[in-house]
Amino acid sequence: MDWVPWIFGLGDVRWLGWASEYPVSLVLWLLCFVGHLGIWCVVFNRVHATALPRKFRKQSEKVIVPIVVLPFCYMVVGMCLWFDTTFDSNYIVFKIYMFLAVVSSFYFVGRWVNRRFIVGLPAAVVSSERVWLDIRERVHEEVSGDFFEGAVPQLLGVVPFNEASKLTLQKVTLAFDIPEQLEGFKICQLSDLHLTGHICIEYFQEIVKEANQFEPDMVVITGDLIDEAICLSWLESTIGQLKAKYGVFYVLGNHDKRISDEAMLRGKIEACGLVAVSGAWHEVDVEGVKIVITGNELPWYRAVDQLPPPDQQPESDFAILLSHSPDQLEWARDYKLSLIHI
């Protein structure tokens, strides 16, 4: 079978008896779906990685989600009900897109295989362990109301195999060429807590307890802390209870922009004892060893523009960046930072 001409005629293949007669066709259709999903996941992620107005981003979701879902539903229903389901592929644009989707699938699958099985962990990673804790089971006796608040969260909470109440703990041991005073230095990173009010406050209090049991030397929070102003009153009894020998540091992320009064938000966070590091160098002395911490909140907040150029970076034995966006990796390389928390 000549693949390229076949792909350009892909939409003319009918489902009736198709899977058994055309196994290669089935594989190519699946590749087409993988590529289609990958393309629109990239679009979705890039839109949400920008500082575009939230209204525009929410409207874009109403376009992207149907584009992703409807072709799957159309073809799956056709298979299940043995409909004579055919895409009209007389349009050259449709044919070209299907061809690009198949080609893209090789790229996405290749990237996944390379990252998962070939490249492996970075050289600095000595070990990495991951465990999942079901917080709902831990706090069920302490929760005065419902664990999930609101009809939709409650409905989603009963869906089998959902992980809405689970906490992922990942313990990573890193090896650096560092002064002996930093041997065994423990950093606890919290990210994407998303205080929305949809999950009870006890859930987040239990996360803080778990973090404190780790007895970290330093705690860093890397964005998307709070979505709804109604949860501002939760800050003191949640993140305000974090304990670390050398301090608790934070940067904001895209979801924190939902709190329109930025100065008020930062004021309440810092009133809980957290230290803002975006656009500044914060120095920490660890038994005579100098650690500097900075933060980059681009593209959502501009404080990083206040930093001096890389050649004026303060001297240190170890430099740490906090960011909510992996797009700042090149920026971090310019500043020759030792460790990046995203």
Go through the PLM ranges and name each one.
Residues 1-167:
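Non-catalytic terminal accessory segments
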Residues 53-58, 89-98, 196-285:
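Core catalytic region of metal-dependent phosphoesterases/phosphodiesterases
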Residues 167, 176-188, 282-293:
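Beta-strand-turn-beta hairpins that frame and shape the catalytic cleft
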Residues 189, 221-222, 295:
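A structural signal for the hydrophobic beta-strands that form the central parallel beta-sheet
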Residues 194-199, 225-228, 296-301, 318-319:
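Short, flexible loop segments at the rims of nucleotide/cofactor-binding pockets, characterized by
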Residues 217, 246, 317-319, 338:
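Conserved acidic residues
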Residues 267, 271-273, 287-323, 329-330, ...:
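Binuclear metal-dependent hydrolase catalytic cores centered on His/Asp/Glu-rich metal-binding motifs
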Residues 340-342:
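Conserved small/polar residues in nucleotide/adenosyl-binding loops
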